Amino acid sequence: MTSTLPPLPDDASAATFVPPPEAVVAAPFDQLALPAPVLANLTRLGYHLMTPIQAASLPVALAGHDLIAQAKTGSGKTAAFALPLLQRLDARSFAVQALVMCPTRELAEQVTQEIRRIARAEDNIKILTLCGGTPIRPQADSLAHGAHVVVGTPGRLMDHISRGSLKLDSLATLVLDEADRMLDMGFFDDIAYVAKACPK
């Protein structure tokens, strides 16, 4: 089968702007270099053909490139970043290896649920949601027991970093979901604080 996926960039040192989703032809997930159990789980979940944003971004992200992408709600963008971040996890290490920042608690909870669904093919992947509006101490206790992926809002993530309960020394993936909305909501300083705490 001839690949309909976009070519990969030559330079992995800079963020790649993926092509507009409407310019990418949908392709099956088995064109991606994903393990068989992951592909089987995607089929069980009803993922057959990649959406345009998935086809545009997954090959780039799975190859280890940073990227900047834009897509509408309901376009499948969560899977577009969840699959690559899950592939980079070391399940044997319960240090935080992936961090997803979202503008609201509601979106963070939705993202967490979708990542959990996609992670079913992996063994013992722990995903935590850290948002305001709930007590911080139970969240800190959960972090102390270890987690692979953290999804949260900027302010609460900043709180945990400043308290020392969220350590990002082992972080491999940082996702800003709806970054434009977070900036519109005045989270620039919070995002900058969290980003500064991430490994270079």
PLM feature segments, named:
Residues 60-61, 142, 166:
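Conserved alpha-helical segment in the helical subdomain of ABC-type ATPase nucleotide-binding domains
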Residues 1-65:
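N-terminal intrinsically disordered, low-complexity tails of helicases
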